[in-house]
Amino acid sequence: MMQLYIANKNYSTWSMRPWLVLHAFNLPFQEILIPFSEEADGGAFKQQMLALHANGKVPLLQHDAVMIWDSLAICEYLAEQFQELPLWPKDPTQRAWARSICAEMHSSFMQLRSLCSMNLQPDYGRHGQRLWSEHAVLRAEVARIEQIWSNRAAVDGFLCGEFSIADAFFTPVVTRLQTFQLPVSDNTQRYMQKILQHPSVVAWITAAQLEQPVRRMEQYPR
């Protein structure tokens, strides 16, 4: 059975992405959660991860003797291992688009990621209002995200019709927009609700809300 090493569900966006793929497609895996430490240098968390792999980060997937790190690499590995399942869209054109937007998510939207860290417990709406008014780059990044989502196959569907790796990659963006209550269009809100109602997303968020806060990871006062 595969083993997926993750960190706190309340904070770890990169852990969330492959976990959602594994869970949504009912793939056999064992979740191993290594909680973040309060120490600035990572403390026990960093030590435990370095003992597993030189990368020292989550997520980490172990499949027999194979170790795969980085969320995108893990998802590509899963798509190769389970080719009978539509982890990527079957249509070549849709698959190319899905891969492109995942790669863009993987390498872009730095302001959103730095200013609006994932936290599934508090309501940061008042912080979101301030950040939105102060940061033009943040507004531009959200506009680009909305543009991507507006190209989905159907307004009431997932990005490529059915839930896929692409949706898993943008789920932490959905939660950020919700936690910080950033202003978005009705079209975007419909996609957000579609994601937030997915059973795997519900399962992750439910578990995240039961976790104890890690002070070091709390970006803003609650």
For each of these PLM feature ranges, what is it?
Residues 187-222:
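Long hydrophobic alpha-helical segments typical of transmembrane helices together
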Residues 1-130:
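GST-like domain detector, emphasizing the conserved glutathione-binding G-site
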Residues 105-197:
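GST-like fold's C-terminal all-alpha helical module
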Residues 56, 85, 155-156, 202:
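Secondary-structure boundary/capping positions in well-ordered alpha/beta enzyme cores
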Residues 4-6, 161, 178-179, 203-204:
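Short, contiguous strand/loop micro-motifs
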Residues 81, 101, 180, 207-208:
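Residue-level signal for well-ordered alpha-helical positions
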